[in-house]
Design a protein with these regions (language model features):
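Conserved G1/Walker A P-loop phosphate-binding module
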Residues: 1-111, 139-140, 144-145
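Amphipathic alpha-helical transducer elements in NTP-driven molecular machines
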Residues: 32, 46-49, 62-68, 82-95, ...
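Glycine-rich, flexible loop/turn motifs
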Residues: 23-31, 38-40, 48-51, 80, ...
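C-terminal-of-GTPase-core extension/linker across diverse P-loop GTPases
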Residues: 2-6, 11, 17, 144-352, ...
Length: 365
């Protein structure tokens, strides 16, 4: 999974990126300190996988990972090449979802590119640039469909009509993900890789005094309402606090520091969970003496397709899957004990994978 971290200059996105990846990219207090995208890969914390590691002592331990891309800041006119806009737009297209960092605190010592804190205005600035870029893409798609239809392929008449409707929606300053249409039409639109179709987490960057009570912050309330109207998520976070936590290497010291602050889990953990929820993702686990590994799949994935994540031969020659829920395995202590209690199931091609399934796939090619 790849998440693009975006936001106006000086809203805290590079500070957040530094905290969650320990990448050490610049986070200075001036516009465009992030000129090129900085990429960091972080492991997805999973206590289930760690338990399996302690049981099997494998040669290799492979958690699921998320790739975070810190992309250069935007200003008005970015879709037309102002600031660093063109580079931003090309880099954001490759992401699975967007983490849009929004400033939700007042601080006279930290300059704001627009002069004052106004999270909805800031969101509108970036979203408008994304909409403008999508308009250009949709216009080209309509032209291409019209030409194909005139060439005799009448199937493209429907495509032209669908994208004309979307174009009208975008020209009203609305996001593609809020377009009301049939599932078939949306499936067609999804083939266009539009920026405003991407799922978005609005990371509301609060100050240290507010992050534990975000609902009391009017800025956050506004961001949350907007996110809900778009079918997205608003996540309260304090980038500065996350940076302080990330500087602590000792786990016990880190836990003590978080307890003193009243923070139960890090912003990274909450961001990862929010990403999985928003994109409809789950993890299944494989375990043995060679490797313990977590695999990320979409909710609703059937066993053969999950097996294909490991290797295409597993899907092609799928026979069955030996499955046990992690909690059942942990309760029993060992796989042998779980088998003795009849908790290990044999599942076929129609089995829908569940989060936390511990699986052994049987195949023949």
């Amino acid at each position: 999974m790849k998440l693009g971290i975006v936001g106006l200059p000086n809203v805290g996105k590079s500070t957040l990126f530094n905290a969650i990846t320990n990448a050490g990219v610049p986070a200075d207090n001036y516009a465009f300190c992030t000129i090129d995208p900085n990429v960091g890969v972080v492991s997805v914390p999973d206590a289930r996988l760690e338990w399996l590691r302690d049981q099997h002592h494998p040669k290799k331990f492979t958690p699921a990972v998320i790739e975070f891309v810190d992309i250069a800041g935007l200003v008005k006119g970015a879709s037309k090449g102002e600031g660093l806009g063109n580079k931003f737009l090309s880099n954001i297209r490759t992401t699975d979802a967007i983490v849009h960092v929004v400033r939700c605190f007042d601080n006279a010592n930290i300059t704001h590119v627009e002069g004052a804190t106004d999270p909805l205005r800031d969101i509108d600035i970036i979203n408008l640039e994304l909409i403008m870029a999508d308009i250009e893409m949709v216009e080209r798609r309509v032209d291409k469909a019209v030409k194909a239809a005139k060439g005799g392929d009448k199937r493209f008449n429907r495509e032209a009509d669908v994208f004309r409707g979307l174009l009208e929606h975008l020209n009203e300053g609305k996001l593609a993900r809020t377009y009301d249409c049939s599932p078939d039409d949306m499936a067609l639109i999804a083939t266009s890789d539009l920026l405003t179709l991407k799922k978005t987490i609005y990371a509301a960057n609060l100050d240290e005094n507010s992050v534990n009570d975000p609902e009391s912050v009017p800025y956050f309330q506004k961001v949350k309402a907007l996110a809900e109207s778009e079918g997205c998520l608003a996540l309260p976070i304090c980038a500065k606090l996350e940076a302080d936590i990330a500087e602590l290497d000792d786990p016990e010291e880190k836990a003590m520091f978080m307890e003193e602050l009243g923070v139960q889990e890090s912003g990274l953990d909450r961001l990862i969970q929010a990403s999985y929820d928003l994109l409809g993702l789950i993890s299944f686990l494989t375990a043995g003496s060679d490797e313990c590994r977590a695999w990320t799949i979409k909710k609703g994935t059937k066993a053969p397709q999950a097996a294909g994540k490991i290797h295409t031969d597993f899907e092609r020659g799928f026979i069955r899957a030996e499955v046990i829920a992690f909690e059942d395995l942990k309760t029993c202590g060992t796989l042998a004990a779980a088998k003795a209690k009849g908790l290990v199931r044999s599942e076929g091609k129609e089995y829908v994978m569940k989060d936390g399934d511990v699986v052994n796939f049987l195949f023949n090619v």
